[in-house]
Amino acid sequence: MASEVAVIAGAGAGLSASLARLLTKEGFRVVLAARNTAKLASLVEETGALAVETDVADPASVASLFEAADKQGPLALAVFNASGRTRGPIAEVDPDAVKQALLVGAYGGFLVGQQAARRLLARGSGSILFTGASASIKGFPGSAGFAMPKFGLRGLAQSMARELFPKNIHVAHFIIDGQIEPVGKKPERPDSQLSPDAIAQTYLATHRQHRSAWSFEVELRPWVETF
């Protein structure tokens, strides 16, 4: 029997790398999607994952990603971890940069979610997980270009969950409230950042939840974070 496939869109260091390692260890065939796959070389060598050059804001590119994943086995899990962002005062922020952030962070989530849903509906089970942030529910000064795609992604996840839960497809949205530990850097304050390995464990646990008690929205933050 072919291994189940997990697609991670927006792959890079940090959370995506932790997910790739964990899912590989748990027996998944991992497919990593990124605009620049060269940066994934060491992770691919470590995990045996397939890296596919992908523009998540391009329908044809996302379709090609999932066609490549189809050749690896049946899709069981899709994680959208891509993020479009730009910051700056509302009177000064670059409109083109905001448009690109929306294309990557919200429209890209739709394209990945759509391709995943088609396959999981045909299979009759599986999970689609979206990575959000505190900006998914709260707009901060100077962050319109980040809040807009994150609000949009959350709305997408809500709509998909209400449509797909009754069809045995688990859709979940994660609010990452805080900074994820950067690779190779110690936080200035102990416990002030989220461990990417710990987040990955929560994603996997959510995927494996019994369908009598599915989560939709999961908030994750360091225990010292004020909220």
Placement of each model-derived feature along the sequence:
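Active-site loop of short-chain dehydrogenase/reductase
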Residues: 4, 74-76, 89, 120-133, ...
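Conserved glycine-rich cofactor-binding loop
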Residues: 12-13
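Conserved glycine-rich Rossmann-like NAD(P)H-binding loop of the short-chain dehydrogenase/reductase
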Residues: 26-42
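The beta1-alpha1 cofactor-binding region of Rossmann-like NAD(H)/NADP(H)-dependent oxidoreductases
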Residues: 54-65, 95
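Substrate-binding pocket helix/loop in short-chain dehydrogenase/reductase
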Residues: 89-90, 97-99
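Catalytic loop of short-chain dehydrogenase/reductase
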Residues: 127-152, 157-158, 162-165
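C-terminal helical subdomain
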Residues: 166-182, 186-227
